[in-house]
Amino acid sequence: MQLTFVRPATTDGRSAGPVGCPAGPGGVTDLLSGLSRTEPPERPEGVCIRRISQDRESIERIGRLYFRSYPDGEAGICEEAVADVEATSAGDYGTWVPEACLVAEEGGEPVGAILVTDNPPWDDVEGLIFIIDLFVAPGKRGRGIGGALVGAALAAVGDREVGLRVESENAAARRIYERHGFAAR
């Protein structure tokens, strides 16, 4: 089951509650929403976080990371994963938010990414900033990379309301989002 999380916008710049990401095929979601933080996020040592370039080579690298980051078959085949990242970049899931679409790199290699859009096409999150996906390479999890990406993306969007969806059984992702002030909707 998918959970949708929303973090409502507030004027004091502090977080209000947990969040989530889109689930795979057949999943159900609850909405989580939250307010972005204004303080810079902590970053794991040796990890660089920067904007994702929308050139073909960069999008393909992020698509391959997306494919590797999920269990076999969950992201389809590699070409489908790349096509999904391309579709996000092209605006199929809302307007790409360049300052919040970020990649974490270690030694020049991508180890995690967050894809964020504005005004996604789904009725329950219309008008929100929306975290389309957050993914970290399997061997790099548990080091704070996902949390650093979420924190950096939230800082980039200011005090806008942010939503996302996450699989209910994905406890690690839920903890990341809840630490950043998101709550189930």
Name the predicted role of every residue range:
Residues 6-14, 138-141, 163-174:
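Conserved beta-strand-loop-alpha-helix junction that forms the acyl-donor binding cleft
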Residues 101-103, 109-118, 130, 135:
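Conserved beta-strand in the GNAT
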Residues 48-67, 71, 75:
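A short beta-loop-alpha structural element at the N-terminal edge
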Residues 70-90:
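Conserved GNAT-fold acetyl-CoA-binding loop/helix
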Residues 133-136, 142-156, 174-179:
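Conserved acetyl-CoA-binding loop-helix of GNAT-fold acetyltransferases
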